Amino acid sequence: MKNIAIIGASGYTGAQLTALVHAESELSIQGLYVSENSLDKGRALADLYPVYSHIDLALSPLTEEAKAKIVAEADAVVLATEHSVSLHLAAWFYNQGLAVFDLSGAYRFSDVAQYPKWYGFEHEYPEVLAKAVYGLAEWNAKEVAATKMIAVPGCYPTASLTALKPLKNLLTSAYPVINAVSGVTGAGRKAQLHTSFCEVSLTPYGVLGHRHQPEIATQLGQEVIFTPHLGNFKRGILATITVQLKPGTTTADVAAAYSVYDQAPLVTVKQNQFPKVDDVVLTPNCHLGWKFDENSGYLVVASAIDNLMKGAASQALQCIKIHFNL
């Protein structure tokens, strides 16, 4: 039995992860934590999320005493916190010997020079950053098993990279074009007018400047054009990607490339049949659908995931189970 501490448990991702860990027979929850100044401290998780009424746990403030208790009792800590908060907490818990699974972007880039531009802070822990592994579960399982500092990928990068990485050896120098739509839970639980359900209308945002663009490009090893969109639905991501493949590539070559997922139980691939968000919501699955035009050399692949599950909480759980060989 491995004990897991979850910090940032009051948010959508933290609460979803709590439910997933609670359902695992080989995992237990050491505690649920929020910041000391959170208005949710002391409240039961079920008060915030009645759907989790079967989970009889309260949200504790992350005091110095609580941190010491986590170190003494937990095998791993999951951070569902702001980037600037995870930056410090991840390094502290890692240096105490715990396995850290960080759902923020604070450890996703190996290059410290990326952080001021994309996250607005200087990275203060290059020695910990050097140990971090990008937790794209289907691709980096060996690395996740071997390190105690796991940076869980972003939601858009998970959808995009799952679709693109099998094609790496077939791509030309032309930038893949990624258009992705996410439900409003991707913006978090904090009340904001522009993410209020009655205000949301399908619209692009972060055009040519979203921080997930360099994350995707870094992990793919090739620049991309990435345009996210906010959709008027609660949860889920659909990424539709257009790529140019090398001259002479055949449909059989594409099928062979995607056969890498034949033994991946959470990834489903279909040719000439495209996924729907509703089919992956509340699941840890990724559904891919593709079609290739041999005459033009262009391929369109669509990727559907639940942004709170495969795009966050369930991928963190995948990494936890890989790391502890569960």
Swiss-Prot record:
Main localization of the protein described in the UniProt heading: cytoplasm
Organism: Shewanella sp. (strain ANA-3)
Record protein name field: N-acetyl-gamma-glutamyl-phosphate reductase
Subcellular location: Cytoplasm
Cellular component annotations (GO), alphabetically ordered: cytoplasm
Lineage: Bacteria, Pseudomonadati, Pseudomonadota, Gammaproteobacteria, Alteromonadales
HAMAP family in the record: ArgC_type1
Pathways involved: Amino-acid biosynthesis; L-arginine biosynthesis; N(2)-acetyl-L-ornithine from L-glutamate: step 3/4
Domain of life: Bacteria
Record-stated family: Belongs to the NAGSA dehydrogenase family. Type 1 subfamily.
GO molecular function: N-acetyl-gamma-glutamyl-phosphate reductase activity; NAD binding; NADP+ binding
Keywords, in A-Z order: Amino-acid biosynthesis, Arginine biosynthesis, Cytoplasm, NADP, Oxidoreductase
GO biological process: L-arginine biosynthetic process
Broadest EC class assigned to this enzyme: oxidoreductase
